[in-house]
From Swiss-Prot:
Protein name: Histidine ammonia-lyase
Phylogenetic lineage: Bacteria, Pseudomonadati, Pseudomonadota, Gammaproteobacteria, Pseudomonadales
Pathway field: Amino-acid degradation; L-histidine degradation into L-glutamate; N-formimidoyl-L-glutamate from L-histidine: step 1/3
Any Gene Ontology CC annotation: cytoplasm
Modification 2,3-didehydroalanine (Ser) occurs at: 143
EC number: 4.3.1.3
KW Ribonucleoprotein (keyword) present: no
Similarity comment: family membership: Belongs to the PAL/histidase family.
Post-translational modification summary for this protein: Contains an active site 4-methylidene-imidazol-5-one (MIO), which is formed autocatalytically by cyclization and dehydration of residues Ala-Ser-Gly.
Domain of life of the native organism: Bacteria
């Protein structure tokens, strides 16, 4: 993928593509003047002997310590070395690439006082697929993502290591792959690299992208379950949802109508049945999934803004010659967006688990107990439903909001923090849980449909059915179940059901 970056204009679709695959990045020339002006402003402050935080002072609680001109370069190198204190497993290439893209986008806005040379070095690393070692843990999301961004920056100054096409290389070798040599950071540049919400935002963006894929899958699986359970189409009638007026609900109901078309032989087979109302997990899908969609859209809006934001501190306003300390590094918007995504993921999984449970109950589903013939000898989906219940319950605990947590840091100078990285990275575990739940529902709904006398569903639902059946056959009798769940989960992880939903329903698709 080639991406020509106009600073501050990244879209969610751009970010999704950059997360999914390597990118060839170029920077629009319009960035040159603002970048140069901000650097000149920093240089003028030093030349005039003015005091400005982060340029010629210490950091955090040490901000009142004035640094001599002779030590300014050492100051910037020292902040990178000392702040690289993260722990845990290394982020994968996709996450590091996303972090670096976000950092380039922020720095290139021209409010950070960092030279084009440094920004170009980050771009060169991205283009050469050289990804610095960044540990998963160590940021509280204020004052920015200091530790992980310090690890990202170590490679630029010839320290630490980076991964290139699966191989770890010492920093000097990694730089050489990208045609670079170690940099000497000028005044303000170390702080500009470290300060910002790019890691928190990348964590939450991954959560958003996975949540979107799972939302699409849950909508399709929910439609399949309606068919398998001989559910009514009446609850999806557009008039019901227009009367309420909730945009997300209206859009989701339309998506279900698109899946549950009148061409379905399954639907026609029970048009004259005497069932009045279906259980809520079937009937209220537009209401619940619509609320989830609204949460996801709101979170996506916040994250797209943050992806294009300047979250450095202090900020350089070159036109006025001012350097002003503020708090854009505080990732509270990201933390709250991630918390809202967590609520949506928990509900998507919870609703799916309830549909699975309905299909297991022969009194509710009018299907063989646990979706298998010769019950007793065969246990069918009995324990698969238990697995889904365990995963749904796990997500209830993980959905607890991270943004309400705060621990003071930096000797109480940084006395309120966002915990945005925690809010973001727990989304990955939640998404994995939801993927497992939906895998069981997909398997179960297709098994249920196979019992419906060979009747076909609508074209799109038949397409979803074929996708699964190409990998997992019908259950004639009990067999080793876990590999089937894994096969369905891998299909879901590919986003293979996204195309079955209307275009532009989800923010980044």
């Amino acid at each position: 993928m080639s991406l020509h970056l106009k600073p501050g204009q990244l879209t969610l679709a751009d970010l999704r593509q950059a997360y999914l695959a390597p990118v060839r990045l170029s920077l629009d020339p319009s960035a040159d003047a603002p970048i140069a002006a901000s650097v000149a402003c920093v240089e003028n402050i030093i030349a005039e002997g003015r005091t400005a935080y982060g340029i010629n002072t210490g950091f955090g609680l040490l901000a009142s310590t004035r640094i001599s001109p002779a030590d300014l370069e050492k100051l910037q190198r020292s902040i990178v070395l000392s702040h690289a204190a993260g722990v845990g497993e290394a982020l994968d290439d996709a996450m590091v690439r996303l972090v670096m893209l976000l950092k380039v986008n922020s720095l290139a806005r021209g409010f950070s006082g960092i030279r084009r040379k440094v920004i170009d070095a980050l771009i060169a690393l991205i283009n050469a697929e050289v990804y610095p070692h960044i540990p998963l843990k160590g940021s509280v999301g204020a004052s920015g993502d200091l530790a992980p961004l310090a690890h990202m920056s170590l490679v630029l100054i010839g320290e630490s290591r980076a991964r290139h096409r699966g191989e770890w290389l010492p920093a000097a070798e990694a730089l050489a792959v990208a045609g670079l040599e170690p940099l000497t950071l000028a005044a303000k540049e170390g702080l500009a690299l470290l300060n910002g919400t790019q890691v928190s935002t990348a964590y939450a963006l991954r959560g958003l992208f996975e949540a979107e894929d799972l939302f699409a899958a849950a909508t399709v699986c929910g439609g399949l379950s309606v068919e398998a359970m001989l559910g009514s189409r009446a609850p999806f009638d557009a008039r019901i949802h227009a009367a309420r007026g909730q945009r997300g609900q209206i859009d989701v109901a339309a998506a279900y109508r698109d899946l549950l078309t009148a061409s379905s032989e399954v639907a026609r087979s029970h048009e004259k049945c005497d069932k009045v109302q279906d259980p809520y997990s079937l009937r209220c899908q537009p209401q619940v999934m619509g609320a989830c969609l609204t949460q996801m859209r709101q979170a996506a809006e916040v994250l797209e803004i943050e992806a294009n934001a300047v979250s450095d501190n202090p900020l350089v306003f070159a036109a006025e010659g001012d350097v002003i300390s503020g708090g854009n590094f505080h990732a509270e918007p990201v933390a709250m967006a991630a918390d809202n995504l967590a609520l949506a993921l928990a509900e998507i999984g919870s609703l799916s688990e309830r549909r699975i449970s309905l299909m297991m109950d022969m009194h509710m589903s009018q299907l063989p107990p646990f979706l298998v013939a010769n019950g007793g000898v065969n246990s069918g989906f009995m324990i698969a439903q238990v697995t889904a219940a365990a995963l749904a319950s796990d997500n209830k605990a993980l959905a607890h909001p991270a943004s309400v947590d705060s621990l003071p840091t930096s000797a109480n100078q940084e006395d309120h923090v966002s915990m945005a990285p925690n809010a973001g990275k727990r989304l990955w575990a939640m998404a994995e849980n939801v993927r497992g739940i939906l895998a069981v529902e997909w398997l179960g709904a297709c098994q249920g449909l196979d019992f419906r006398e060979g009747l076909k569903s609508s074209p799109k639902l038949e397409q979803a059915r074929r996708l699964l059946r190409d990998k997992v056959p019908y259950y004639q009798e009990d067999r080793f179940f876990a590999p089937d769940i894994e096969a369905a989960s891998q299909l879901l992880a590919s986003g293979c059901l996204n195309a079955l939903l209307p275009a532009r329903l989800l923010p980044s698709l």
